[in-house]
Curated annotation (Swiss-Prot):
Signal peptide: 1-19
Protein name (record): Conotoxin MiEr95
Localisation per UniProt entry: Secreted
GO MF entry, a single one: ion channel inhibitor activity
Record text about domains: The presence of a 'disulfide through disulfide knot' structurally defines this protein as a knottin. The cysteine framework is VI/VII (C-C-CC-C-C).
Keyword Membrane: no
Keywords: Disulfide bond, Knottin, Neurotoxin, Secreted, Signal, Toxin
Amino acid sequence: MKLTCALIVTLLFLSITAGDSRGKHRYNALKSMSREANSTERECREKGQGCTNTALCCPGLECEGQSQGGLCVDN
């Protein structure tokens, strides 16, 4: 009986707290990550800077040696 009551109280508490935080980011890091993911403008890498799949070179440059940590070079 005591176990059942404790279980019911726990479930009520969890359901109330889960419903209260809906739509809110708990951590600032999550806010900045979601803002960054939604951003359509990204900084590009200049000539001689490192590039990857996510850090792209500026227009007119290409990423050479990308699989090993590439560099932006002229097209």
